Amino acid sequence: MDWKSMLRTGVHKPGALTAGLSVFLTLVYVLNWVFPINEKILLDPGALRKLQLTRLSLYPLAHLSIFHLLLNLMSLFVPLSMFEASHGTVFTGITLNLLAIVTGVVYCLVGMLLYPNVYVGGASGWCFTLCGYFAVQEAGFRPHYELASLKMPTLYIPLVFLVLVTLLMPGSSFVGHLIGLGLGYLIGFRERWLQMATPPGWLIVKIETWLDRWISMIPSVVKYHRESSVDRTAGYTPLYQESELPLHNDNFPGQGRVLGP
């Protein structure tokens, strides 16, 4: 499965978790206009010391502006749907929660020393984690991408995005994004560690069996990826097939490739 086919209506339905999370993030943002939700879930560097578990796990749901929300939704939708399709809906949900907690803990440990009064929120940490993860997977097939005479190592492309986001949006959390990206690289290189930190597949299958009645009620416009239908050991399919990559130029003696989508 490639990312472009997911954007073609009717070819691949978005994952149930991906679609549901997009709706839920939007709902939380709207409800925050009426109820002070963000005040309760924004990540405070002192949350770890105060054992505020709500802040440590729910801060990705908080968004400070409509631009912040839309940017994260657009950045998250395709890579998360790809990850969900290859790893399963429940497994992906557990992974997101685990990533939020680990990122939050590391952010607090650093923040208590460097920025004790800086609160953060938003799903951009997940975006950078997925970006790092897929960069590692893609680099195994294509170590470099070329644009004109510029050759960019595939593994470094997320770092370029990180720098650009930091420069264009100076109010964003560089440390939070860096932690998220680092976790993405870690999962990409050591995905077995993620498997060890999550419930075994047989348990997820059992839970899905218990919840089968409710799972069957999920609208058909999205796809629920059951644990029994995914194979997390299957090989990765690169974003671009080799036949899609060449960009010929009579004035350029080599072969060019598009950078990114």
Curated annotation (Swiss-Prot):
Its main location: Golgi. One of its GO terms (molecular function) is serine-type endopeptidase activity. It is a multi-pass membrane protein. It is an enzyme of class 3 (hydrolase). GO terms for cellular component: Golgi membrane; nuclear periphery. GO terms for biological process: proteolysis. The chain crosses the membrane at residues 17-37, 58-78, 94-114, 116-136, 155-175. It holds the Pfam family Rhomboid. Keywords: Golgi apparatus, Hydrolase, Membrane, Protease, Serine protease, Transmembrane, Transmembrane helix. It catalyses: Cleaves type-1 transmembrane domains using a catalytic dyad composed of serine and histidine that are contributed by different transmembrane domains. It is found in: Golgi apparatus membrane; Golgi apparatus, cis-Golgi network membrane. The active site is at S124, H177. Its EC number is 3.4.21.105. InterPro entries: Peptidase_S54_rhomboid_dom, Rhomboid-like_sf. PANTHER family: RHOMBOID PROTEIN 2, RHOMBOID-RELATED PROTEIN. Belongs to the peptidase S54 family. Probable rhomboid-type serine protease that catalyzes intramembrane proteolysis. This is Rhomboid-type serine protease 2. It comes from Eremothecium gossypii (strain ATCC 10895 / CBS 109.51 / FGSC 9923 / NRRL Y-1056) (Yeast).
